[in-house]
Amino acid sequence: MINSKKLLNFLEKKDVKFYTGVPDSVLKNFTNLLSQKNSHILASNEGSAVSIGIGYYLANKKMPCIYMQNSGLANAINPLVSIAHKGVYSIPLLLIIGWRGSPGFKDEPQHLIKGKITKNLLKLLGIRFAVIQRDRDFNKISKLINYSKTKKIPVACLIKNNTIFPVSKKNKKKNFISKDSILRIDVLREVLKNIKSKTKLISTTGYTSRELYQLRKEEKFKKGKDFYMIGGMGHSSSVAFGVSTNKSNQVVCLDGDGSMLMHLGSLHTIGNMNKNNFKHILINNQSHESVGGQKINFIRTNLE
């Protein structure tokens, strides 16, 4: 097991003091500590996180730490290969990757697929990596950091599920929603009560899809035309928009704030088409709830 505070202290002793990334349930006990630091930036997607880290290095000539789930590694490939690669600008980066679907670990189907190919993907990208499972593996991290700084290339730490110690009680996640807010499951219940029977619902990853399925099953709502986005975070609106190209379908996208932020450009495409059979409902709880509850500063953004 890894003590999250010891990990953070170790990285800072190695002069890694800037952190950015996208929340992950495997890393939540580590990233919950990061959320208390001024030198931490929550990115909208993994490619942006890598790009922020690259910019930090260009400005300060110091190695940044970029965290993500392995399912988001694909989002990061473009800047990793097109900017940070040793054949381009040669930028040292430390990637900390939550390894969902690691071999021998029971997980959801979408994670098993990515988990199986994660090591090979890193090898294909030319990124040296190590699997970190306990505090005494910090020497592996040290070697990776030294190698990255010497060769000026990205390196990665793979961390399996149930590896990082829980944070202490004083650091437990907070509820960022006011007492006047409504619960997500109540929003979903009202949607089910008010849509027509043939309406197709496309629900985003995480608790939204789980609770929609739960409501259908437990509260005896009529079986619907639902598509649950168990993976592909940030793409629910585009999938729903694609479904709406069949004009006979009434389509509702049930999205979350963290998901929508990942690929905001999709809203421009969808909005320009002005389709009458497409509705986009955003459930804004100002946090990445299903992967650790990290706060999203969406309260300052006008969504209307």
Feature locations, PLM:
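Glycine-rich beta-alpha junction loops
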Residues: 24-26, 100-101, 159-165, 205-209, ...
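Structural signature of the thiamine diphosphate
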Residues: 7-10, 17-18, 123-172, 304
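Short acidic, glycine/proline-enriched helix-loop-strand junctions
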Residues: 28-43
